[in-house]
Amino acid sequence: MMKILISNDDGVNAIGIVALTRSLSQIAETLTVGPDRNCSGASNSLTLTNPLRLNTLDNGFISVSGTPTDCVHLAIRELYQDEPDMVVSGINAGANMGDDTLYSGTVAAAMEGRFLGFPAIAISLVGHEHYETAAHYALKIVKALQDNPVAQDKILNINVPDLPLSEVKGMKITRLGARHRAEGMVRTQDPAGKEIFWLGPPGDEQDASDGTDFHAVANGYVSITPLTVDLTAFEQLKALDNWLANISEK
């Protein structure tokens, strides 16, 4: 039986990670290791100035006093006697599409699995209701990856529309869309009258054209986007060579 490490960024007690573990336990030996609090927006951050503390919960899940990336790194390096066959992160409560992926702890947990050499996927529900739909597609995709894995230098970022399973139209391979910049900060006061700020909501879709993750989900499809950690803008290399040459000549 394959071994799957499960993590997330919503916290080890979140509905999504429970649903994901229940689903994948049908075909795999699972180890669920998640942060002891909500770490949404943690991206690839690591805990460098404090020790990590573990706590095994009544359901067998392990909570970690760190980030999603910490959880995956610690689990693979210290908790497994043998290595897992795959890392699956989710089910996130809310979309991780377009620019969201830069901030997402869900995506980061999968990326850490990839850094350590394992196939990895991140799965998000674009809403907060139909976790069983996302769990169904997680199981379906993991089964497919058993037989036909993708390159280990990539992860799959999956976003599932918040619909009953019977209403989902299928799956599509997509590229990342893009959002407009986020709305302004929310300024308010704490109980002592001191000024405080909250991050505003994310921006609306800027690029939700055909072929993007936004377009697929909006039209009732599961989006599957391959991601890589190489952020090099290859199409700019030649132009920047010319730019640098002009600087050097002055």
UniProtKB/Swiss-Prot annotation:
One of its GO terms (molecular function) is metal ion binding. Keywords: Cytoplasm, Hydrolase, Metal-binding, Nucleotide-binding. It catalyses: a ribonucleoside 5'-phosphate + H2O = a ribonucleoside + phosphate. GO terms for cellular component: cytoplasm. Its cofactor is a divalent metal cation. A divalent metal cation binds at D9, D10, S40, N92. Its EC number is 3.1.3.5. Binds 1 divalent metal cation per subunit. It is found in: Cytoplasm. Its main location: cytoplasm. Nucleotidase that shows phosphatase activity on nucleoside 5'-monophosphates. Belongs to the SurE nucleotidase family. This is 5'-nucleotidase SurE. It comes from Shewanella pealeana (strain ATCC 700345 / ANG-SQ1).
